[in-house]
A protein has these predicted regions:
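N-terminal "pre-motor" subdomain/linker immediately upstream of P-loop NTPase catalytic cores
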Residues: 1-122
Length: 122
C-alpha cells in the first residue's frame, strides 16, 4: 500500500465515513453508515501500521509520540484544513501499533439526516 496518510484520510472522508480502523493483519478499514469497507485489500503489516500511526502524529502538528510508545495508548485530536477534524485513539494490540480514527465533520448534519422526528424539533 502506498501510504500517503493525508491522501488516505482525504479519500476516506469523501466517502462520508465515520471511523477508520488501523489494525495489523487486517486491511485498512472504514465505516460508512454502519457498514465496514476496506480501503485496499492488502492486509496491513505491523511496520505499515507503525508508519501509518507515526504519520498521524506528524499530521497532528508533530504531536509527541513518546507517551504512546511508553504507555501503549494515547488519545488526541487534530484537523486538516479543508478536509475534516479527527479524534484519534492509538493503542498497541499484540505488540503492533493500532488506531481508531473518528472523523468529525466541520458541518452539523440536518435533523432529517439524523432521522429526528419533527415533533422533537418543534
Amino acid at each position: 500500500m502506498n501510504m500517503n496518510v493525508r491522501e488516505i484520510l482525504e479519500n476516506i472522508t469523501k466517502e462520508h465515513a465515520s471511523d477508520i480502523f488501523v489494525v495489523a493483519g487486517r486491511p485498512l478499514t472504514y465505516k460508512v453508515s454502519g457498514k465496514m469497507h476496506t480501503y485496499q485489500e492488502e492486509r496491513m503489516k505491523p511496520d505499515m501500521c507503525r508508519d501509518f500511526v507515526t504519520a498521524i502524529y506528524e499530521l497532528a502538528d508533530h504531536r509527541d509520540i513518546s507517551q504512546f510508545e511508553t504507555t501503549g495508548d494515547d488519545d488526541f485530536s487534530f484537523a486538516i484544513v479543508g478536509v475534516s477534524r479527527f479524534r484519534v485513539s492509538t493503542y498497541k494490540q499484540r505488540g503492533s501499533y493500532s488506531a481508531v480514527i473518528r472523523i468529525i465533520t466541520f458541518t452539523l448534519p440536518q435533523p432529517s439526516e439524523l432521522m429526528i422526528p419533527d415533533a422533537v424539533m418543534e
